[in-house]
């Protein structure tokens, strides 16, 4: 979220590879994992399948990113650019709808089967035809069951053609094709395992069919995931084995890290992170994530529909105080709808707690003494704690905020039905393209109850024909520079006038043992890479 690409590149270089923020040499003997093995404590309870055409959770996406290849991957140092994965080169036709990819030579799957253009085309066709959750990502470029066989096809053994339903920004198309639903699977292997026309989905739930740097050795549900280096991979890999262990308790992760039983801990509390950095048992690296925590104000509530009230609420949050005392280092203040690391991100946080200014705005809105309103709150950290702090902030201007607790399913269902007053929750991007968030916060083509497009603006009944037009225009803009400028203009508009109080951006903090380097943690789990790991 920087105004210049040079400063953005500097930030993302720091983000993409975990480096030490704080470290002191260890002063006592400790156990250690083998030199060529990397052991990490994390949360594995989201796993229900290993099929990239079915996975739609965070850590499973990370697994897919390291076991499978795709055509391209976004360049984290400059999100307007892309690096070839199995694609050696690519081009776009004059109409802007035909994308031709030329593949590298001598690619092979873990099975030993040759990886050809037919595998690439079949993998994308398979994901669309299975029609699981990830198919929605590919639908973003117009691929559906009716057209995917025609629009995704091999031209020869080394060339694939993908045609979109209309002209999109090339950066958008490449972001979609560089995401996990477009992972390349071993067609020959999966057809041999196919049952009842399932494209091998039943078998792939517990096996793998990839060509990435690591292959699956063993998955024990709720316990561990073991990966082995693929010695036929095109790039050198230092780590022979990667072990992910399910350790739900932060305190246990800390003890394992301090004792040398693991090389990295992904889920330590802020206090634990500070402690292990101070005592020299670990190095802590922070990586901004593409997850925004925000308030949604339902404009069906006539009071919340008033622009002065919406602005007043933005001045009635003690952002810095909540960060300092509640979320600490796990979130940071962020008030625009594009997270750090996205094309066109805008670094602007103008709002702070200003009760006098908020009261003046409420008076202009006709509610000088405040009003009563409810907030649906997920009964989990940090949502409850943040909501309670905001409740106290609002009270300073006479606003009586009643908190309605519920589990995530309950609060989200009410939000999606537009039955809330205020909703506190988060929004995570599926892929690192600005449209992923602009579509949520600044796009509402049909505000009716029967709309087929029920994104965040719709959920808050915010009718925005002009912003919707701008979002559609940015989606089709071929120039990355002009596209970035369009998203910056939209962010300024939403920041100034919208029913969204965007509060914080999530920050992933990884604690690694001294001597560990190269764990690349991007803004989404799909961009976590083990390729450069060293000890």
Predicted regions and their residues:
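Surface-exposed binding/hinge segments that line
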Residues: 102, 139-192
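Gly/Pro-rich hinge or "lid" segments in bacterial periplasmic/extracellular proteins
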Residues: 76, 178-237, 355-356, 360
């Amino acid at each position: 979220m920087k105004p210049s690409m040079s400063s953005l590149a500097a930030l993302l270089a720091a983000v993409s590879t975990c480096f030490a923020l704080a470290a002191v040499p260890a002063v006592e003997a400790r156990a250690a994992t083998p030199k060529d093995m990397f052991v990490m404590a994390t949360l594995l309870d989201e796993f229900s399948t290993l099929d990239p055409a079915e996975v739609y959770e965070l850590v499973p996406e990370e697994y897919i990113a390291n076991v499978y290849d795709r055509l391209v991957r976004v360049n984290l140092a400059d999100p307007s650019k892309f690096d070839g994965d199995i694609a050696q080169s690519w081009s776009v036709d004059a109409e802007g709808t035909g994308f031709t990819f030329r593949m590298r030579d001598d690619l092979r799957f873990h099975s030993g089967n040759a990886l050809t253009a037919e595998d690439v085309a079949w993998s994308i066709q398979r994901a669309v035809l299975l029609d699981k959750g990830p198919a929605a990502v590919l639908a973003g470029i117009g691929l559906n069951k009716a057209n995917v066989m025609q629009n995704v096809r091999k031209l020869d053994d080394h060339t694939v053609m993908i045609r979109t339903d209309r002209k999109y920004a090339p950066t958008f198309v490449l972001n979609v094709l560089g995401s996990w639903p477009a992972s390349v699977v071993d067609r020959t292997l999966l057809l041999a395992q196919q049952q009842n026309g399932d494209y091998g989905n039943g078998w792939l739930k517990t096996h793998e069919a990839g060509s990435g740097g690591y292959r699956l050795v063993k998955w024990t549900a709720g316990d561990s995931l073991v990966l082995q280096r693929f010695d036929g991979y095109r790039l050198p890999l230092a780590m022979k084995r990667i072990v992910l262990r399910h350790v739900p308790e932060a305190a246990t992760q800390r003890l394992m890290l301090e004792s040398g039983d693991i090389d990295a801990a992904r889920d330590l509390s802020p206090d634990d992170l500070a402690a292990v950095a101070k005592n020299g048992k670990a190095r802590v690296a922070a990586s901004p994530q593409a997850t925004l925590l925000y308030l949604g104000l339902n404009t069906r509530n006539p009071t919340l529909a008033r622009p002065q009230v919406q602005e007043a609420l933005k001045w009635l949050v003690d952002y810095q105080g909540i960060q300092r005392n509640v979320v600490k280092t796990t979130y940071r203040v962020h008030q625009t709808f594009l997270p750090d690391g996205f094309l066109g991100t805008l670094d602007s946080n103008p709002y702070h707690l200003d009760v006098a200014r908020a009261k003046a705005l409420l008076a202009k809105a006709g509610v000088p003494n405040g009003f009563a309103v409810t907030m649906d709150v997920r009964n989990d950290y940090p949502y409850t704690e943040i909501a309670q702090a905001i409740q106290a902030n609002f009270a300073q201007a006479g606003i009586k905020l009643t908190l309605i607790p519920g589990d995530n399913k309950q609060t989200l269902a009410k939000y999606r039905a537009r039955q809330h007053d205020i909703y506190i929750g988060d929004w995570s991007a599926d892929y690192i393209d600005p449209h992923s968030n602009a579509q949520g916060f600044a796009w509402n083509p049909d505000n009716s109850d029967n709309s087929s497009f029920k994104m965040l603006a719709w959920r808050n009944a915010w009718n925005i024909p002009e912003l919707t037009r701008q979002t559609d225009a940015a989606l089709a803009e071929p120039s990355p520079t002009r596209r970035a400028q369009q998203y910056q203009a939209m962010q300024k508009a939403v920041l100034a006038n919208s029913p969204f109080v965007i509060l914080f951006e999530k920050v992933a903090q990884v604690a690694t043992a001294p001597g560990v380097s190269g764990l690349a943690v991007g803004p989404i789990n799909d961009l976590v890479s083990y390729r450069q790991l060293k000890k």
